[in-house]
Amino acid sequence: MEIKFINIGFGNIVSANRIISIVSPESAPIKRIISEARDKGMLIDATYGRRTRAVIIMDSDHVILSAVQPETVAHRLNTKENQEENF
C-alpha cells in the first residue's frame, strides 16, 4: 500500500490513508471528542491560533484540529486520489 499525504493547512501534512473522518467542530459530540482527546494527550492542534474549522479523526485515535474547512480537506483528499488513478 502506498502512503498518501494531504495538506491540512499552513504546511501541515497528515497521512491520508489513516483518516477515518473529517467533521465540523460545531456539534456537542465532536466537542466532547476534542475534550477527551485533549485529556488523553491525543489532540494535535494544527490551527496556528486560528479558528478550528475541521476536526480530523485518525485511526490511531488522534484528533487533529485544522483551520481549513472540512469540504476543502475532503476535496484535497479526493483530488489526490483521482490524480493517482490517472497515472
From Swiss-Prot:
Which residue spans adopt a coiled-coil conformation according to this UniProt entry? none
Q: List the disulfide bonds.
A: none
Q: Which Pfam families match?
A: RemA-like
HAMAP family annotated for this entry? RemA (MF_01503)
Q: Its family?
A: Belongs to the RemA family.
Record-given protein name:
Putative regulatory protein CHY_1489
Organism placement in taxonomy: Bacteria, Bacillati, Bacillota, Clostridia, Thermoanaerobacterales
